[in-house]
Amino acid sequence: MKIRASVRKICEKCRLIRRRGRIIVICYNPKHKQRQG
């Protein structure tokens, strides 16, 4: 999980989700997991 100021989709399979006021990216590829901090 990478904590970033700006999160973006890295590939086509990445999904942007809003969870508890935070934007997170989930993907089948674990390297693409991101969270806005």
Swiss-Prot record:
GO biological process, one term: translation
Chief location: plastid
Keyword ATP-binding: no
GO terms under cellular component: chloroplast; ribonucleoprotein complex; ribosome
Compartment annotation: Plastid, Chloroplast
Gene Ontology MF annotations: structural constituent of ribosome
Keyword Plastid in record: yes
Pfam families in alphabetical order: Ribosomal_L36
Annotated keywords: Chloroplast, Plastid, Ribonucleoprotein, Ribosomal protein
Lineage: superkingdom: Eukaryota
Alphabetized InterPro entries for the sequence: Ribosomal_bL36 (IPR000473), Ribosomal_bL36_sp (IPR035977)
Family listed: Belongs to the bacterial ribosomal protein bL36 family.
NCBIfam families, A to Z: rpmJ_bact (TIGR01022)
Name by which UniProt lists this protein: Large ribosomal subunit protein bL36c
Organism annotation: Acorus calamus
